[in-house]
Amino acid sequence: MDLTCTDSIYLCILSSTGEILEQVFGVLTTQLEEMRDLMLKYNVQEVGMESTSVYWIPVWRVLESHFELKLINPYFIKQLPGRKSDVKDAQWIAECMMKELVRGSFVPPERIQQLRLYDRRIYDLDDEIIRKLAKLDAVIQRCNIRLSNYVSNTDSVSYKSVIDKICEGVTSPEELVKEVHGRIINRHGKETIIASLKGCITEVDIDIMTQLKAEIDLAELHKQKCLEKKQDICEREYSEQLSNLQTIPVVKMKAATSLIAEIGTDMSHFETANHLSSWAGLRPRNDQSNKIIKSRRITHGNRYLRRTIIQCAWGASRAKDYFFCRFSYYQTQVRKKNRMKVIVAISRKMLVCAWLILKENVAYKDFDNKILTSDTKG
């Protein structure tokens, strides 16, 4: 079937004898149920559909319990130019399915899909908070308050305390400096900090700051609720796997729940750890022609999983007494490798560890030092 982004689903039923049945259905639930009943009437066994944004999800939910479904990457079933239409797309998908030319994408169980919704909502809220903080800092800079030049970041306690006071209507530098941490004052001098807090603040600026601060607080509240819900589900249904994942160096509750949300706990979907690494986009692409390697950049993959595991890799590269730290030192200082490439290599190793932990249901065991000299590829 070919799913469109508007209000139509093009169904093509292809039998082993070559008979073709084509029909167009709407996207409402009752219309999807009519389509399901028609497919049951014709004894359909396998169903293939393109992964079109999020439009495949409602169709999947209606058909999941009745058919063997395959979610197909559109990249693998591209049509020839000049032969492109919704009906022909449906025919082409049916033909590829019958001849077993395509494989289905990984679609986790319903509970893991629910965890994914929380996990990706958290990432969206993180990005939203960063954008709002940047806008808030722009308003502060417009008022010529230069405190951000002297604090570590715009999410620091001192910076937020000063913003809170300004939103309350306090604009005197002598009063605002009381909210700044003593270490910052000692480092840069009290007079310098007071001068950085002296600006031209209007009522409109205070109003906009108050609105932005309220939006940031709301986003942080929603983020905290999502974190609690995700953690509650994992502790209730995947407690053993959650505990085992947290034995990996620097992998704590947030990262462990994100790993479960993205890859699930059943590793039968990934035949080997290399399959999982490839799916996450942590392997070099195969771009070679006439014995010339054109590119070895990592591939596109699950960006949420890759983001989580790379963040963990940065921490693991600094975690003393563990293999990942020794590996990072050996590759960057002894072999003079690029640090970012080493981080990608560490993240791949950590993902392999996660695959083995979930597959064997065991805790993490650190690598031997001898691996450092034998494993030169990273």
What are the residue ranges of the model-derived segments?
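A detector of single, family-specific signature residues
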Residues: 1-378
